[in-house]
Amino acid sequence: MASTGLQILGIVLTLLGWVNALVSCALPMWKVTAFIGNSIVVAQMVWEGLWMSCVVQSTGQMQCKVYDSLLALPQDLQAARALCVVTLLIVLLGLLVYLAGAKCTTCVEDRNSKSRLVLISGIIFVISGVLTLIPVCWTAHSIIQDFYNPLVADAQKRELGASLYLGWAASGLLLLGGGLLCCACSSGGTQGPRHYMACYSTSVPHSRGPSEYPTKNYV
């Protein structure tokens, strides 16, 4: 019963992490304008994402433009785009593996095989959490490094956008969800041999010793 609860909690956290990763990948808010120095009086804000950049006016109007070329992106955003797409696909693969091994499905009948599939899905989710963390931390490091670089003009400096925080949340949820699935598999797997030994001990007939047979007097 406890392993079933861990599986449900783990898969729910994983789904939330996947949704956060998808939103983080889609939103053009990886880098936002830093209002410092002369840029304080600027009446517009620049958002930079993985797929497009947007300019938000002080009046609320927003204009977005898709990047013309992948090579025009900075190195950190190029890597982030590739890793985010790979992560989303890996999570979908992990979900398919989990569905094959879930207790509520009949794709696989053997209980040990189901436990192995759940364990594999948990490992896949942990790997996807690490892959989500890499581009987010890389982009954050690049933003902070440029922010404190005196050679970079104030108008070109950026701050951490909302997509980075969503990416960190997605990574944490995927790591936690995958870890719970691995724990559920280990806790559920330890009950199988004990149950088998109990059934085996009750099914084996008890052998009698010579002294236990009733003695009869023969005339």
Swiss-Prot record:
Extent of the signal sequence: none
Keyword Translocase among record annotations: no
Transmembrane segments: 8-28, 82-102, 117-137, 164-184
Assigned GO CC terms: apicolateral plasma membrane; bicellular tight junction; membrane; plasma membrane
InterPro entries named in the record: Claudin (IPR006187), Claudin6 (IPR003925), Claudin_CS (IPR017974), PMP22/EMP/MP20/Claudin (IPR004031)
Quaternary structure annotation from Swiss-Prot or TrEMBL: Directly interacts with TJP1/ZO-1, TJP2/ZO-2 and TJP3/ZO-3. Interacts with CLDN1, CD81 and OCLN.
Name of this protein: Claudin-6
